[in-house]
Every structure is written in structure tokens, then in C-alpha cells.
Amino acid sequence: MKAYQRQFIEFALEKGVLKFGEFTLKSGRVSPYFFNAGLFNTGRDLARLGRFYAEALVDAGIDYDVLFGPAYKGIPIATTTAVALADHHDIDMPYCFNRKEVKTHGEGGSLVGSDLEGRIMLVDDVITAGTAIRESMEIIKANGADLAGVLVAIDRQEKGKGELSAIQEVERDFGCAVISIVSLGDVVTYLSEQDGMDAHLAAVKSYRAEYGV
């Protein structure tokens, strides 16, 4: 685990974005942890979040031309990532996001920002079922662009309905890399390094043994 990944886990814990306990997911599974990126909800939080996304992008070394943030959660993520790339890595990357509702006046259309062209890096908070990615793919294809990759905050490394995780299904279906700032494996490593986290570590390991990929 790299320094920025450890710092991201600490940041998520500090802000209550990453919590340990018992949480019933939409799937009905009872998870020993929960990740709610919506709690990164101040200007300072968003600025820090962008730096972690930018760090993960630079670390991954994937070639792309435009950042795309799917509405709604992806919009501030794409924006802050673009700012962080410019401020901290001297990479001036165009960004774009979509509207859920097509605008019929003014500039019109469903896209805001840069043209959606070339190789697209999609940024979002998490991939749960891959639905948002599939919807975004329709937009990307309709503009004649290609999906270069997907970046999310955390990879739960958890089976979906079959044997693959939602992220593995996206990689299989769209032939692109899906990268994350951290994975569940990184969270396990972090917990194992902390004093007083044995109960949470045991619960996460047990959950991973049952549902992990």
C-alpha cells in the first residue's frame, strides 16, 4: 500500500465516509463496513479528495484525453480531479459531465464542459452494480469516443450476483481497466496495522471470505 492510499483511508475515517459496524446493503448482505463518499461535503474535503483521485490517475499511467463525471456524484469528482491534476501535477486535462435532463435552450444538449472525444477516463465514487457505467457508455459511444478506463474511490472486491465483482464485470464487458484509490485489501492491511481494530478486522476478513473475489 502506497502512502497516498494509507492517507486516503485515514481521511475517509476522519470524515465518517468509511465506517465499521453492521450495515445492510441494497443486496441484502450485512456488511461490516460502509463507504459514503457524499460525506466529503466541504470545499476543503473536495480539494483533498481531488488530490487523491489525481494521484491514483498518475500512478496508474493510463493514457486518456478527457475526464468524464457521470451525473450526479461524478460531477464534483471530475471537477476537483481536473483542478488537482492542474495544480499538483501540471496536467491541464479537459473535463466533461452529463445532465440527467436534456437542456433545450441556451447551449442545449446533455453534456457540459469539454467535448467528449478521444479516450475517456470516467471518474465516480464507487461501482455497485455497474449501471451508471453502462449508461455512461451509451453517452460516450454516441459521441464517437472510447472508454479508456474507470477510476473509483474504493474497490469492494466483492462478488455480484455471479462469481465476478461489479468492477470485474465492467472490465470484462467494456475491455477497459478499472482502477481505485484503495481496495478492500488495502483496508484490511490498514486495519491489521492499527491497535484496537481486531474486531473490525476479523469481521471484514470473515465477510471477504464469504463474498470476496
UniProtKB/Swiss-Prot annotation:
Pathway(s) per entry: Pyrimidine metabolism; UMP biosynthesis via de novo pathway; UMP from orotate: step 1/2
Reactions it catalyzes: orotidine 5'-phosphate + diphosphate = orotate + 5-phospho-alpha-D-ribose 1-diphosphate
One of the record's GO molecular function terms: orotate phosphoribosyltransferase activity
Signal peptide segment: none
EC assignment: 2.4.2.10
Matching InterPro entries: OPRT (IPR023031), Or_phspho_trans_dom (IPR004467), PRibTrfase_dom (IPR000836), PRTase-like (IPR029057)
First-tier enzyme category under EC: transferase
GO biological process, one term: pyrimidine ribonucleoside biosynthetic process
Pfam families associated with the record: Pribosyltran (PF00156)
PROSITE patterns to which the protein is assigned, alphabetical: PUR_PYR_PR_TRANSFER
Cofactor: Mg(2+)
Top-level taxon of the source organism: Bacteria
Chain sites annotated for binding orotate: 34-35, 128, 156
NCBIfam families found in the cross-reference section: pyrE
PANTHER family xref list: OROTATE PHOSPHORIBOSYLTRANSFERASE 1-RELATED (PTHR46683:SF1)
Family membership: Belongs to the purine/pyrimidine phosphoribosyltransferase family. PyrE subfamily.
Subunit structure: Homodimer.
Reported function: Catalyzes the transfer of a ribosyl phosphate group from 5-phosphoribose 1-diphosphate to orotate, leading to the formation of orotidine monophosphate (OMP).
Name of protein: Orotate phosphoribosyltransferase
The gene coding this protein: pyrE
